[in-house]
Design a protein with these regions (language model features):
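Short, well-structured alpha-helical segments
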Residues: 32, 36, 51, 64-72
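Charged low-complexity interaction tracts in eukaryotic proteins
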Residues: 2-17, 22, 26, 68-135
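Charge-enriched amphipathic alpha-helical scaffolds
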Residues: 57-95, 188-225
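Short acidic, hydrophobic short linear motifs in intrinsically disordered regions
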Residues: 44-55, 62-65
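Hydrophobic, Leu/Ile/Phe/Ala-enriched alpha-helical segments that form helix-helix packing faces
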Residues: 39, 54, 58, 71-75, ...
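Positively charged, polyanion-binding regions of nucleic-acid-associated proteins
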Residues: 20-46, 154-157
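Extended alpha-helical interaction scaffolds used for oligomerization/partner binding
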Residues: 124-249
């Protein structure tokens, strides 16, 4: 059994007290929401870029000192992200200044996937949603209700041998999570269907439709590897199917 660290909590309280000399509780909470939302949306982002996004979307801007003071507080709290400098996660890197540290999703550190995603992000432009949309991603289970997502939901619901809305939603979330991964494939959808015991009636005749729906969902879902762009959007920008991570149903 673990017990709270009184000294650690005392330090946190002192840090918050100092920050509240400059920021209201409401403005501190807004920072928290941005940290959580961008963590889920981008999975890796520099504090410098996050700082820029926040100030671009709010008329009452933050000073860099206050922003970094809050970032330092989060390093001593429990979140689904960690903040590290490049020198702390990669070899032979110069020491990072606080503003150049990375906000990294916890799952990437847990499965040691951060290096691949960090590499893929380099040199790409960033898609930044409007403030109201971006902050919806504070909820790690938020799913943008795109036409492609709704079409996949309709397919799963229509072909379920027994209706179980909760299980179908779990299946859809698993599929949506998968389309954002490095090696996304429509065959993963079949694996999830079996795993979640949805008992979909997907015969040989319906399998091409599942492949098409999966590829359309993949190509129209905002992807952290593409810094928030969808594969379709990145393909339109570059004309490069491979670099855009575009999936063509004819390839399966």
């Amino acid at each position: 059994m673990s017990f709270p660290n009184p000294d650690g909590q005392k330090k946190l309280d002192e840090m918050y007290t100092k920050l509240k000399e400059h920021l209201s509780d409401e403005r501190i909470d807004l920072l928290r929401r941005y940290f959580e939302a961008t963590n889920n949306f981008y999975q890796i982002i520099t504090l410098k870029r996050l700082f820029r996004i926040i100030n671009s979307q709010n008329s009452e801007t933050y000073t860099e000192d206050d922003f970094l003071a809050y970032a330092e507080i989060t390093r001593h709290e429990r979140h689904y992200f960690e903040i590290y400098g490049l020198d702390e996660i990669f070899e032979r890197q110069p020491e990072s200044t606080p503003i150049n540290r990375l906000l990294i999703h916890e799952s990437l550190l847990e499965y040691n996937d951060y290096a691949e995603l960090y590499s893929e992000k380099q040199g790409r432009a960033y898609y930044v949603p409007e403030k109201e949309v971006l902050l919806k991603y504070e909820d790690e289970f938020y799913c943008e209700q795109t036409p492609q997502f709704l079409a996949m939901r309709e397919f799963c619901t229509k072909n379920a041998k027994k209706s179980d809305d909760e299980v179908i939603e779990d299946l859809l979330f698993a599929i949506l999570f998968n389309v954002k991964c490095e090696h996304s494939s429509p065959f993963d959808a079949l694996e999830f269907i079996n795993k979640f015991s949805v008992q979909l009636d997907v015969n040989k005749k319906k399998f091409p439709e599942l492949i098409r729906l999966y590829c359309e969902l993949h190509n129209n879902t905002r992807n952290p590897f593409l810094n928030g762009f969808t594969p379709n959007e990145w393909l339109q920008r570059t004309g490069d199917e491979t670099d855009s991570r575009y999936l063509d149903p004819k390839d399966f």
